[in-house]
Amino acid sequence: SGRVMLYVPKEKWIGKLLEYHTFKIKLDENGKEKWKTIHRGKLINCSDIEIISKFNTEIRGLYHYYQLAHNVSVLGKFAHIMEYSMYKTYACKYRTTVRKMVDKYSRNGVFSITYQTKKGLKWCEFYHDGFKRVREVRLDADTLPEYGRKYNNPNSNAARIKRGVCELCSQQTKD
């Protein structure tokens, strides 16, 4: 039709999946590719809320980048692989099966993790808003959800090391 259109290149979302180490490609006996989701070992030591918010942030980030594209709905495939990689990450963390993790954390058919705030118990749900094409740009697209900013634990090992104070003798460390 002579118009310039924005599309989501297949190589980009597959490249992101490979970059995040969420799946591996195996060849069957006929030489056909088989995609197998895998857990993300680097996230196993993170808290439950950090794991789900990491996956949500990565999915939302790619969606918001390509939300004006004509074929943005192909990111549903991206989200599906990310979802099962997240399930496998939780299953590996708790040394159980994917089915048991889905059954344990599903609430009204949506995978959800609880977290505590000053106002009480809240739920962080896995992204399930779909990938509909947006015709107008949202100005608040870069605003993170509240749990993404507030849930950095000040008593985490990294924060304790950054303080530069020995916890045994209270002396300042050099590094």
Regions from the language model: what does each represent?
Residues 1-175:
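Non-catalytic terminal/accessory segments
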